[in-house]
Structure formats: structure tokens, C-alpha cells
Amino acid sequence: MKFYDLMSKSAEDVGLQLSKEQYEKFIDYMKLLQEWNEKINLTAIIDDEEIIKKHFIDSIKAFKRDEFKIASSLIDVGTGAGFPGLPIAIMRADLNVTLLDSLNKRVSFLNTVINRIGASNVTTIHSRAEDGAKDIKLRENFDIATSRAVANMSVLSELCLPYVKVGGSFIALKGPSVDQEIIESTNAIKILGGKILEVCEINIEDTELKHNLVVVKKIDRSPKGYPRRAGLISKNPIK
């Protein structure tokens, strides 16, 4: 229970309670992350405490936004090793969470974690984000699309907003400096049916980490031509 108090306080800060059972799931997740990371590149963060703070607590802090507390469905686009989607799913067993990633090895890792911790509310999809968004079973089918992927807001919006229902939200976990990104992505977000609602600052206890949650409301349907084909999105972002 070495990190229970730290994680419990972080959960309380965003209005949640961390049970001992949930904590044990996080520890199992961490052990599998470290074990698999020796075989495939999942994360550069391998120290126990660093994983707790920079992956688990960072993901849990998303609950500072009430959207994560009331949603029925969520997709994590380009989830990688499962952040933030899987920690969110552990904290809310009643939330249907979909983890989407383009690399089959990462999806295999996620399936192993899901089976180990008994996360029956989580499903995985092996697909590129731009391909998945064309699937009628996925397109405009989620209350929330989220991503912690390393891409600018214009690119992320094109990849994520098509998954969101009208009335839902795209919430990006971004670094400390987002002002210029937001200015440059405002028109792209508008074209894709979104509107920037708020930027919410996140602090991680006992670290110098400062992150931002960029909240985009889906107010209209995304045009059928988006997202565009692979490669074009990052090479030629919507201006």
C-alpha cells in the first residue's frame, strides 16, 4: 500500500474515492507495464513512483472536468500504454471505455492488463485513428473522445472530434503551453463541428508538472470528408 495515500489524496482532490480494490488494480497495471516494457517500448517512465505520478495520477486528474464523471461512453484515441483511458476506466467501472491504438503489440499489452484486472467495461480496437473514425459503429458514437497523444490541437481535433456525438466533448490532455496551439487550431475545430469551451490547468502533487485539459464541445456534425487519409493530416493541418 506504499502509494495508496498519495493516489487517494489525488482522487479526493477531483471528487473521487479510491478503494483498496482499485488501488490493487493500479499496482497490477504498473507491474505489467514494467514487465512488458522490457519487450516492447511502451514508456520511458519505469520507476514505480514516476509511473504513479506521471501516468496514473496524471490520468485521474482528468476528473477535474465533470464530463468524465457523467459520461456513459469514452474513446481514448492513440491510447498507447492506456493513458488516460484505462486509469479512467478503473476509477469508473460503470463507464464504457474504448481504447484505440494503431500498434498491435500495444493492443496485446492492453488486453493482458484488462484481463488481469478484470476491467469488463473496457474494449480495445486495433486501428489507425483516421480509419476508425470512418467506421459507422464508432463515428459520432461517444460522449467523450480524449487523447494524451503528442500532436498539435489541429491534428488531434481532426482525429478525435469525428468520434464525438453532437453535444459531447473532445478533451485533450496537453502540456503547460497551449495558448498558441489553441489560436492556430480554432478554425480547424470550428470546421470539424467543435467549439473551444475551456482550458483547465492541472497540477500533479510533489512534481513540477503542469498540464492543461483543453475542452472542446461538439456542437455540429463533422463533415464526411474528415478525418482525411493517413499522412495528410499531420503534413497539411487544417488552417
Swiss-Prot record:
InterPro entries: rRNA_ssu_MeTfrase_G (IPR003682), SAM-dependent_MTases_sf (IPR029063). Signal peptide: none annotated. It is found in: Cytoplasm. GO terms for molecular function: rRNA (guanine-N7-)-methyltransferase activity. The keyword Kinase does not apply. It holds the Pfam family GidB. Disulfide bonds: none annotated. Keywords: Cytoplasm, Methyltransferase, rRNA processing, S-adenosyl-L-methionine, Transferase. S-adenosyl-L-methionine binds at residues 78, 83, 129-130, 148. Its EC number is 2.1.1.-. CDD domains: AdoMet_MTases (cd02440). One of its GO terms (cellular component) is cytosol. It is an enzyme of class 2 (transferase). Belongs to the methyltransferase superfamily. RNA methyltransferase RsmG family. Specifically methylates the N7 position of a guanine in 16S rRNA. This is Ribosomal RNA small subunit methyltransferase G. It comes from Clostridium beijerinckii (strain ATCC 51743 / NCIMB 8052).
